Each structure stands twice: as C-alpha cells, then as structure tokens.
Design a protein with these regions (language model features):
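Cyclophilin-like peptidyl-prolyl cis-trans isomerases
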Residues: 1-143
Length: 143
C-alpha cells in the first residue's frame, strides 16, 4: 500500500509497511481517508532529526481520541532517512501523530521504541524544506 502526502511544500510518496505493521498502517490510512490530516500542521520540526505532524490541536497534545498499540518487533524498525514513524507519549499511546526522519544520525535510539510504518520513496527533498507551521494539505491512500 502507498500514500501520497501533499504539503504546501510539495508531495511525498510513501511506501507503507502494511505487511509488517498492519494495525498502525490501518489506523493511519483510516484517518487519512476520513480527511483527519487535511489542513493540520507540522507542529514540531527539529533540523537533522525529524518533522512531526498529525496533531489536531497543532501543539503536540492532541490525537484522535483513542490509542493504538506499538508494533515494534517487525523487521523494518530502523529510523533511517525518510522513515515514517508513530509518535507517542509512551508505549501504546500513539494515535494520529507521526514523524518523518531527516537522517539516521540522530534517530537510532528510537529503534524498537516507536513504530516505523512507512518510508518516503519519492519527494524526499520535501522533508528538508518543511518548517514549523507548514501544512499537510491532504493524504491520499493508493491501494
């Protein structure tokens, strides 16, 4: 399964790890299909680390109103450049917030802690142009 993340800075094409992290991918795609992410901002941007979005409050404090379990035992659980991962406040507290890694340099400590559920395969340059407050225009799921 694939996703197209349309932002005000360009489009990122993402391969989703639906075989490895089925519950996380289902949650993400369900929210995307409902338009949950449309118009939300990247509220947290840390250079050489990651860009984070998916908070309906725009502050990092919101979510969809429920939590999902982590799926961190799959094979593709390395936070490399372009990897899409679920943000959370502790084990099994993810919901809608996600982050995309800038590089492997500062992310190894996240392996096995946060669920990696996809990777940007095209439009990787967009990651580097995103700034705090930039918008997710829409996320299109391609099955």
């Amino acid at each position: 399964m694939k996703a197209e993340m349309h932002t005000n800075k360009g489009v990122m094409h993402i391969d989703l790890y639906d075989a490895e992290t089925p519950d996380t991918v289902k949650n993400f795609t369900d929210l995307a299909k409902k338009g949950f992410y449309d118009g939300l901002t990247f509220h947290r941007v840390i250079p050489d680390f990651m860009i984070q979005g998916g908070c309906p409050n725009g502050t990092g404090t919101g979510g969809p109103g429920y939590n999902i379990d982590c799926e961190t035992s799959a094979e593709k659980q390395h936070h490399d450049r372009g990897v899409l991962s679920m943000a959370h406040a502790g084990p099994n507290t993810g919901g809608s917030q996600f982050f995309i890694c800038h590089s492997r340099t500062n992310t190894a400590h996240l392996d096995g802690v946060h669920t990696c559920f996809g990777k940007v395969t095209e439009g990787e340059d967009v990651i580097d142009t995103i700034e705090g407050g930039d918008k997710i225009e829409k996320i299109v799921i391609v099955e």
